[in-house]
UniProtKB/Swiss-Prot annotation:
HAMAP family cross-referenced by the UniProt entry: EF_Ts (MF_00050)
Gene Ontology molecular function: translation elongation factor activity
Role noted for this protein: Associates with the EF-Tu.GDP complex and induces the exchange of GDP to GTP. It remains bound to the aminoacyl-tRNA.EF-Tu.GTP complex up to the GTP hydrolysis stage on the ribosome.
Protein name, UniProt field: Elongation factor Ts
UniProt lineage: Bacteria, Pseudomonadati, Pseudomonadota, Betaproteobacteria, Burkholderiales
C-alpha cells in the first residue's frame, strides 16, 4: 500500500475543500491515487448533499453587493444559527452575491450553473455541504441594474434591505434602516399586493360581522380597517422610525430624495421550522432500545 503523506492530503484538500480526515481516508482507499481519491470524495460529498437535501433550512444569511448602479441582495439558508456564522458559508454567500451582480442569472437554477473560481455554484454548494455537514440552499435574490443610485443595509446577517433612489444618500440609508425595522410590503398603498388586501378584508369582515351592527355600518367598518392596514404596510405612509412626527414620504420630500424601489429579505421568512419534541425523541429512543 502506498504511503499517504501530508502533502498528498493537503493537495487533495486544496482540490476538493473536504475535511482533512476525509481526504486521508479517500487517499487510503485509493491507494495513494490522487485522481481516484478525488473522484471518491466527489461521490461521497454528493451523497452527503443528497442525504441533507430533505432537511429544513430556516436559518442563514442575507448578503449584499453593490458596484456602482448594480446591486444584489441574496438569501442563503442553512439548518442552524451556528453554521450561519461559519466563515466558509459567509465567504460563499459573498461570492454568490458578487456573481449574481456580474452575470445576471435569470433565477436560482441558472445561478447554480454559473462558476465560482472555475467550479459551478452547485458543485461548490455540494462540496460545502460535505464539509460543514448541513443542508445549504440558495433561496432567492434580487438584482438592481436600472441606472439608479443604490444603498443597502444589513441588520446583522438576518435582515437585508436594498433601496434604489435619487437624491441624498444619507436619507436613502435612513429609509433602508426604516424598512428593516418596520417591514413595509410596498412603496405606496396602491402597490400593496391584491392577495394581502383580500386577506385583510376577510379578517375585517369577520370581526365587523360579530359587532351585530347594521350592514351599512359594517361595510364602513370594513373599509376603515382596510384603509388603516394599507397605511400601516406601505412605506410612504408609515411614520418615519427616527421621527414619528412625520411620514417617510414627508421626510423624503424634505431631503429632496425619491425612492424608486426596495427589497427586504428576512432570513427564513415563510419557512416552517421543524419543532423538535425532546420528550417524544427520548421516548422513541427508549422504545427502540427495548426492541433491541
Amino acid at each position: 500500500m502506498a504511503a499517504i503523506t501530508a502533502s498528498m492530503v493537503a493537495e487533495l484538500r486544496a482540490k476538493t475543500d473536504a475535511p482533512m480526515m476525509e481526504c486521508k481516508k479517500a487517499l487510503t482507499e485509493a491507494d495513494g491515487d490522487l485522481d481516484k481519491a478525488e473522484e471518491l470524495l466527489r461521490v461521497k460529498l454528493g451523497n452527503k448533499a443528497s442525504k441533507a437535501a430533505s432537511r429544513v433550512t430556516a436559518e442563514g444569511v442575507v448578503a449584499s453587493f453593490i458596484d456602482g448602479t448594480t446591486g444584489v441582495l441574496v438569501e442563503l439558508n442553512c439548518e442552524t444559527d451556528f453554521v450561519s456564522k461559519n466563515d466558509d458559508f459567509l465567504a460563499f454567500s459573498a461570492k454568490v452575491a458578487e456573481l449574481i451582480a456580474k452575470q445576471n442569472p435569470a433565477d436560482v437554477a441558472a445561478l447554480s450553473a454559473l462558476e465560482i473560481d472555475g467550479v459551478s455554484v452547485e458543485a461548490t454548494r455540494t462540496a460545502l455541504i460535505g464539509k460543514i455537514g448541513e443542508n445549504l440552499t440558495i433561496r432567492r435574490f434580487a438584482r438592481y441594474a436600472n441606472g439608479g443610485k443604490l444603498v443597502s443595509y444589513l441588520h446583522g446577517t438576518r435582515i437585508g434591505v436594498m433601496v434604489e433612489f435619487d437624491g441624498d444618500e444619507a436619507a436613502a440609508k435612513d429609509v433602508a434602516m426604516h424598512v428593516a425595522a418596520m417591514k413595509p410590503v410596498s412603496l405606496s398603498a396602491e402597490q400593496v399586493p391584491a392577495d394581502l388586501i383580500a386577506k385583510e378584508r376577510s379578517i375585517a369582515e369577520q370581526k365587523a360581522a360579530e359587532s351585530g351592527k347594521p350592514a351599512e355600518i359594517v361595510a364602513k367598518m370594513v373599509e376603515g380597517s382596510v384603509q388603516k392596514y394599507l397605511k400601516e404596510v406601505s412605506l410612504f405612509n408609515q411614520p418615519f422610525v427616527k421621527n414619528d412626527k412625520q411620514t417617510v414620504e414627508q421626510m423624503l420630500k424634505a431631503a429632496n430624495t425619491t425612492v424608486k424601489g426596495f427589497t427586504l429579505f428576512v432570513v427564513g421568512e415563510g419557512i416552517e421550522k421543524k419543532q423538535d419534541d425532546f420528550a417524544a425523541e427520548v421516548a422513541a429512543q427508549v422504545a427502540a432500545a427495548q426492541k433491541g
